[in-house]
Amino acid sequence: MAEQYSHDKVVPDTASAESKKKQVAEMFDDIAPRYDFLNRFLSAGIDVSWRRKALAKLAPLNPKLMLDVATGTGDVAIMAAKQLRPEKIIGIDISEGMLQGGRIKVNAKGLETVIELKSGDSETINFPDNTFDAVTVAFGVRNFENLEKGIGEIYRVLKPGGRLVVLEFSKPKLPGVLQMYNLYMGLVAPQVAGAVSNNKKAYQYLNNSIQAFPEGNNFVAVLNKTGFTNTSCKPLTLGICSIYCGDK
């Protein structure tokens, strides 16, 4: 049985009796129209370079068939189509609102024959074993209802010799930077994002889930436990984001 982690129990609305999965899907449906704008604004655009660096970890594999888990509005899938030029990318997400926004972007860029965005759950990925050459997850593993189960499913659908690349928020280690980060993520970001999206709880949840997530070596240990090899963690931008890799 998959182990439970403290972050698995972090939810957008603690007063709700709904499951984390259902709450997260509803939350992203609600903020979907402003999601891309807030991503660029709150990160000052640096999230684009983070995605590019993460995808560079897949370049040596020259993947032909890719899966993007928690694809959201398709930012990683679209960038991967241009940067890695695979034959096909499947993006899955539990939020139909985010997928609708992603499909509009994919069609606008003429990538509809390369990228397919569809409803899908990380914990029950609807593909056979050993299907994909590479799997990506950007800012999504924190939202898994059961982290270990989701990572195990990714391992299952990845081909032998394939690679998982995860991009996820982490906490800086330098004391002065950590205090500034906590102030920004705990107070400033929820206030600003709440005013723009009319959903302050979504960005309070963002901070709470970052604080609870088993980052760094702890997440590498999860990858190792589920069978991945050659695992690694590379912090970016003073440690506020990290790239994790694991091979099957």
Language-model regions: role of each:
Residues 167-222, 226, 232:
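C-terminal alpha-helical "lid/dimerization" subdomain adjacent to the S-adenosyl-L-methionine
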Residues 34-37, 44-65, 79:
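Conserved alpha-helix/loop element of class I SAM-dependent methyltransferases that forms part
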Residues 222-248:
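C-terminal lobe and adjacent flexible extensions of AdoMet/dcAdoMet transferase-like proteins
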Residues 1-26:
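N-terminal auxiliary segments of SAM/dcSAM-dependent transferases
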Residues 148-163:
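A short glycine-rich, Lys/Arg-flanked "PGG" loop and its adjoining helix->strand segment in the class I
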Residues 123-134:
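A short acidic, Gly/Pro-enriched loop at the edge of an enzyme's catalytic core
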Residues 65-124:
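Class I SAM-dependent methyltransferase SAM/SAH-binding core
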Residues 35, 135-136:
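Hydrophobic beta-strand segment of the Class I
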